[in-house]
UniProtKB/Swiss-Prot annotation:
Residues bound to ATP: R218, D219, E220, Q227, E475, G527, F528, D529, R530
Keywords from the named record: Aminoacyl-tRNA synthetase, ATP-binding, Cytoplasm, Ligase, Nucleotide-binding, Protein biosynthesis
Residues involved in L-aspartate binding: E172, R218, H445, R482
Record EC number: 6.1.1.23
Sample GO molecular function, one term: aspartate-tRNA(Asn) ligase activity
Region (Aspartate), start-end ranges: 196-199
Annotated CDD domains: AspRS_core, EcAspRS_like_N
Name of the featured protein: Aspartate--tRNA(Asp/Asn) ligase
Record text on subunit structure and interactions: Homodimer.
Protein's cellular compartments: Cytoplasm
Key word ATP-binding present: yes
Length: 581
């Protein structure tokens, strides 16, 4: 090796030792002929000092930012008052007796470690962006988590199996990335949205316990926590029940967090889907703070406010939710109340009513429409005290859940009620099997999930053996017990409006495999990128992927996607139509 130590490994215990270090010039300073260089490698920074009397001085004087250096010298203590407590190596420096410039660099277009730089520019020069020790530490966490995943699951008897990347297009919710076949003219492979069907087939193959750190692809609109290609920890096991998979996932997450320096407690809290929606307006609630939504529709059945009264009289389809904010009367001004109303309107609210809890009175636009006894019950039910404010959401239940859940989270963020150093896990269970979207029936998870009762008249009341693991308000993973009988799978396809012919065309191989003695089985997939984002306290999923895509699904570094030449298209039997003008 060209070096004896990494930069940040050096400390006071090395004073008087001859060392050789390698890295990049982070900063260069010339103080009256004495040259100071902050040398940076993956571990951190150490200060180099070169006096005018040394042979290395001429070379040191020519060094500039991002030059690649090999430096040799003796470690000494920094002078009194010259220590740098911000650096791990801030008590020492290296006095140079030899310096080699291995490579030069022009002035870099971005400052290493400067996160204020436009993200697209950072991604264009990602190889520079990744030079910071902070970036390296993120990928050290990612590596440690991957190793811990393999060790943990192997210890529990799981077999790692790789499933195909080139596969068949199947409807799993998002659009597929299609790959044209050169050999089979006019036919296409699809990149897998998940290994779902293959891992089920492995259970039918008798593999019993499977896992894979799998690359998945979805052609969907991007958000801060989405990428067109992403990684998940994929798990499937046979002859199991929901409890078995939950136990495996909890022990796995405990091992991963422990490997990354954090201990978590298991088992995790559980919450039925219906309760999560009613109490938090979300199927992935953040429980690092309390502030639940409370149903108060019954208190408005006899209200003199016609709008609230009409809403309250249809308790099956509507909701009136109260959100009591502790200390909110002091926090919210007329201006911030207006901003809160503007916020919920963006998500379908018609307005935002409220009641302020004063010392000797209740104030707000709703007070005059509610009887004194109902007001007393309201205050008691939401546990309101002097200085609090109660917000109200009223209307169709799904809309109210959504905007009141978002308001709950926004208020907690604005009032700084969330402990950023806390990890709060939660299982959401008993999901609906189906949902209606613009009149069309869809599977809430996916169509291979085991339903609890297919004979209910109202299809939206059918629940499934499905479960999501949530961490700090982010869905970390989801899974289910799978359908293992072809008759049930065919019935689910039928309820989803998938014809017998379509089911045969798209899933014939699965239906046939199910008919050959498929065992009861189930599994879970945990979003690996999201997990690392939370473990490393990163702001975006793009920070934890070495070469991510932008929110426009492009790569500024390689300029992908790009056009290809006509010869390549001809080989694939493809002709690109010019966009009509």
């Amino acid at each position: 090796m060209l070096r004896t130590h990494l930069c940040a490994e050096l400390g006071e215990e090395h004073i008087g030792t001859e060392v050789q270090v390698c890295g990049w010039c982070n900063t260069y300073r010339d103080h009256g002929g004495v040259v100071f260089i902050d040398l940076r490698d993956k571990s951190g920074i150490v200060q180099l000092v070169c006096d005018p009397s040394t042979q290395a001085h001429a070379i040191a004087s020519s060094v500039r930012d991002e030059y690649v250096l090999v430096a040799k010298g003796k470690v000494r203590a920094r002078g009194a008052g010259l220590e740098n407590p911000k650096l791990k190596t801030g008590m020492i420096e290296i006095v140079l007796n030899s310096l080699i410039i291995e490579n030069k660099s022009p002035t870099p277009p971005i400052a290493i470690g400067d996160e204020s730089v436009n993200e697209e520019l950072r991604l264009k020069y990602r190889y520079l962006d990744l030079r910071s020790p902070k970036a390296y530490n993120i990928f050290k966490i990612r590596s440690d988590a991957a190793i811990a995943t393999r060790n943990s699951l192997q210890k529990m008897g799981f077999l790692e199996v790789e499933t195909p990347i080139l596969t068949k297009a199947t409807p799993e919710g998002a659009r597929d990335y299609l790959v044209p076949s050169r050999v089979h003219q006019g036919e296409f492979y699809a990149l897998p949205q998940s290994p779902q069907l293959f891992k089920q087939l492995l259970m039918m193959s008798g593999f019993d316990k499977y896992f894979q750190i799998a690359k998945c692809f979805r052609d969907e609109d991007l958000r801060a926590d989405r990428q067109p290609e992403f990684t998940q920890i994929d798990i499937e096991m046979s002859f199991c029940e929901q409890e078995d998979i939950i136990s495996v996932a909890e022990n796995l997450l405990k091992d991963i967090f422990s490997a990354c320096g954090t201990e978590i407690e298991i088992p995790f809290m559980r919450l039925p889907y219906a309760q999560a929606m009613e109490s938090y307006g979300s199927d992935k609630p953040d429980l690092r703070f309390c502030m639940p939504l409370v149903e108060v529709g019954d208190l408005f059945v006899d209200s003199s406010n016609a709008i609230f009264k009409n809403i309250a009289q249809d308790s099956k389809n509507n909701r009136i939710k109260a959100l009591c904010v502790k200390g909110g009367d002091t926090f919210f001004s007329r201006k911030t109340l207006g901003e809160a109303e503007d916020f919920v309107r963006k998500f379908g609210a018609k307005g935002l009513a409220y009641i302020q809890i004063k010392e000797n009175e209740l104030k707000g636009p709703l007070v005059k429409f509610i009887s004194e006894s109902a007001l007393n019950e309201l205050v008691s039910r939401v546990k309101a005290e002097v200085g609090d404010i109660i917000f109200f959401g009223a209307g169709a239940k799904k809309i109210v859940w959504d905007y009141m859940g978002r308001l709950r989270l926004k208020v907690a963020e604005d009032m700084k009620l969330i402990n950023e150093n806390e990890y709060k896990f939660l299982w959401v269970v008993d999901f609906p099997m189906f949902e209606k979207d613009e009149g069309k029936t869809k599977a809430l998870h996916h169509p291979f999930t085991m339903p609890n009762d297919l004979d209910k008249e109202d299809i939206e009341e059918i629940t499934s053996v499905a479960y999501d693991v949530v961490l700090n308000g982010i869905e970390l993973g989801g899974g289910s017990i799978r359908i293992h009988k072809d008759s049930i799978q065919k019935r689910v396809f039928e309820l989803l409006g998938i014809s017998t012919q379509e089911a045969e065309d798209k899933f014939g191989f699965l239906l046939e495999a199910l008919s050959f003695g498929a065992p009861p089985h189930g599994g879970i997939a945990i979003g690996f990128d999201r997990l690392i984002m939370l473990l490393s306290k990163s702001q975006s999923i793009r920070d934890v992927i070495a070469f991510p895509k932008t929110q426009r699904a492009t790569c500024p570094l390689t300029l992908a996607p790009s056009k290809v030449n006509d010869e390549q298209l001809k080989e694939l039997h493809i002709r690109v139509k010019n966009e009509l003008k």
